[in-house]
UniProtKB/Swiss-Prot annotation:
Residues 209-244 form the UVR domain. This is UvrABC system protein C. InterPro entries: GIY-YIG_endonuc, GIY-YIG_endonuc_sf, GIY-YIG_UvrC_Cho, Hlx-hairpin-Hlx_DNA-bd_motif, RuvA_2-like, UVR_dom, UVR_dom_sf, UvrABC_protein_C. Its main location: cytoplasm.
Length: 616
């Protein structure tokens, strides 16, 4: 939080005398020195003067002006520069009165490497590796689905480079027809593999018809050469591709590369639904719920979304040549178009009121936006009802933030603690945390709980992040340990959270939970109580978050090769074994005699290796 400013009222008249008519960006601060609004202007003096008129339009603007204690101005050469600077400031300060796009995920791509035998894989983040990138896709699930389809259509390798480099025999993917096994010589010619890579590239570019035409030609050539087995392979590929074509809606303009942005607004909340269309096909879609002041205008919401969404080049986002909008951007349209064109290095068009197939796309985006918004509002009402009931049940004035802790381990191994956070909109996942617990006796849940609470609350906390309730998934013992750890920290806080233990019933069935207070008082809520449902929700979230972290830790241990624990096997011998056998799976199936055939491996060492692999 910034240093507090002088609380006397802002002298707008004196300030405006110093403001220029040039383009630029302004930052407005409140009494404690926090940036509460960032804006841009073609004419700074004209724009800033509009805030301090006698009759200010809009409830949001009036509330903003009441809180202004200071304004900083940055002059820019052009309006385009101002738009980019405004975007950077909004990302930096996350001002209260700005519309904020809550989207912190980078978009995934399908990556085709430029190796001798290229590999298909999923990619996120900056494009540092040499190769070709296809996308972006709306989420990792869409990429995995596409890669799974690609394995069936064009069986080029998807294995890690380390696996590929150490194989001497084809893997299971080859056996089931999902890979051509370029790792093993003589199974496929260089030309045939290159052809399949070319087909995959064309398919990812949306050029299905070109791929089918080439495959038909190859099938006919194979038939004429009496190579009927190869002709049948090409025929199967053609049929599979045609089945895929039938499942996709394709516009008549097969070269369409565009994003379609639908928007819906209701009860102070907005939903923006984006359809990503590449080569005339719907690549995917996604709904966004920007954080916004309750009375923000639709034009402002959409303008802020477009700016923040497409200027976020760090997310690897591609700006298509055409962006279809469900609402006009008004005065901002020209500068946004110019800015996006400058960034993309080509002409970008923002279009409203489209016709034909584009109108169908927009209607689809608008329908999806309204559907997602209706669902979100319904969920929000349910959450609000549950918070209200819990507040009444616990006799609290307000509940704005709750945190819940749980511990997960297997027989004391790889202990992981979780902390999940709920606010009045439900799970606040960006504040979820996991803690790997170390330095305790395995299985000591009390010590684990003490450690996680000390790590969570032992450092200075922002006042707004101090919870109103801390739930501990456990009984009296866990709650008592938690209180002893947290009490010294709570004494320094401006408010005192309520500590509650959630003890499961004897049968451990949902609905039979007992709530335990630090005073020793216990009580239960009816099984149909909305307050109990909220407690179960946060408890289950914490439990699942801990378990998934624990499983990830266990999986890391299991990935460690059993060979690493065999005395006398260093990196070189380990690599020789894997290369000779064609991987760990094949090595595990080998007999003692077969292992002893590996150069540098004696019979005695082969015996040790065999025993370690069979019983490890």
């Amino acid at each position: 939080m910034s240093e507090a400013l002088d609380e006397k009222s802002f002298d707008a008249k004196s300030f405006l005398k110093t403001v220029t008519h040039q383009p630029g960006v302004y930052r407005m601060y409140d009494a404690v020195g926090d940036v509460i609004y960032v804006g841009k202007a073609k004419d700074l003096k004209k724009r800033l003067s509009s805030y301090f008129r006698i009759n200010v339009a809009g409830e949001k603007t009036r509330a903003l002006v009441k809180n202004i204690c200071k304004v900083d101005v940055t002059v820019t050469h052009t309006e385009t520069e101002a738009l980019i600077l405004e975007h950077n400031y909004i990302k930096l300060y996350l001002p209260k009165y700005n519309v904020l796009l809550r989207d912190d995920k980078s978009y995934p791509y399908i990556f085709l490497s430029n190796h001798h035998h290229p590999r298909l894989s999923i990619h996120r983040g900056t494009k540092k590796r040499k190769g070709e990138y296809f996308g972006p896709y709306p989420d990792a699930g869409a990429v995995r689905e596409s890669l799974h389809l690609m394995q069936k259509l064009f069986p080029i390798r998807q294995c890690e480079d380390s696996v590929y480099a150490n194989r001497s025999r084809p893997c299971l993917m080859y056996q089931i027809g999902r890979c051509l096994a370029p790792c093993v010589k003589e199974l496929i010619t260089e030309k045939d593999y290159e052809d399949q890579v070319s087909f995959a590239r064309l398919f990812l570019q949306g050029k299905d018809r070109q791929v089918i035409a080439s495959l038909v030609e190859k099938m006919e050539q194979a038939s004429q050469s009496l190579n009927f087995e190869q002709a049948a392979t090409f025929r199967d590929q053609i049929q599979a591709l045609r089945r895929v074509q039938e499942q996709q809606f394709v516009s008549h303009d097969s070269e369409d590369d565009l994003d379609v942005i639908g928007i819906a607004h209701q009860n102070g909340m907005a939903c923006i639904h984006a359809l990503y269309i590449r080569q005339g096909k719907i690549l995917g879609s996604r709904s966004y719920f920007p954080k916004m002041p309750s009375d923000a205008e639709l034009t402002e919401v959409l303008s802020s979304f477009i700016t923040q969404f497409y200027l976020n080049q760090a997310e690897g986002r591609v700006i298509p040549s055409v962006i279809i909008l469900g609402e006009n951007l008004g005065d901002d349209a020209a500068v946004i178009t110019e800015t996006l064109s400058d960034i993309a290095g080509r002409k970008i068009e923002l279009k409203v009121n489209p016709r034909g197939n584009r109108a169908r796309y927009l209607k689809l985006a608008q329908t999806n936006a309204m559907t997602a918004l209706t669902s979100k509002l319904s969920h929000k009402m349910t959450i609000h009802e549950r918070f209200s009931e819990l507040r009444k049940a616990l006799n609290l004035e307000t509940i704005s933030r709750m945190e819940c802790f749980d511990i997960s381990h297997t027989m004391g191994e790889k202990t992981v603690a979780s902390c999940v956070v709920f606010n009045q909109e439900g799970p606040f996942k960006q504040d979820y945390r996991r803690y790997n617990i170390t330095g305790i006796t395995g299985g000591d849940d009390y010590a684990a709980m003490g450690q996680v609470l000390e790590r969570r609350y032992g450092k200075p906390m922002e006042p707004e992040k101090i919870p109103d309730i801390i739930f501990i998934d456990g009984g009296r013992g866990q709650l008592s340990r938690a209180y002893n750890v947290v009490k010294p920290f709570m004494d320094e806080w401006p408010k005192q959270p309520l500590l509650i233990g959630i003890a499961k019933g004897v049968t451990r069935k949902a609905g039979l939970e007992t709530l335990i207070f630090i005073t020793g008082e216990e009580f239960s809520l009816p099984s149909d109580s909305p307050a109990l449902h909220l407690i179960q929700h946060i408890r289950d979230e914490s439990h699942n978050h801990a378990i998934s972290g624990h499983r990830a830790q266990r999986a890391k241990v299991r990935k460690r090769s059993a060979l690493e624990d065999v005395e006398g096997i260093g990196p070189k011998r380990r690599q020789a074994l894997l290369k000779f056998m064609g991987g760990l799976h094949e090595l595990k199936r080998a007999s003692r005699e077969e292992i002893a055939k590996v150069p540098g491996i004696s019979k005695a060492l082969a015996e040790k290796i065999y025993d370690a692999l069979q019983h490890g």
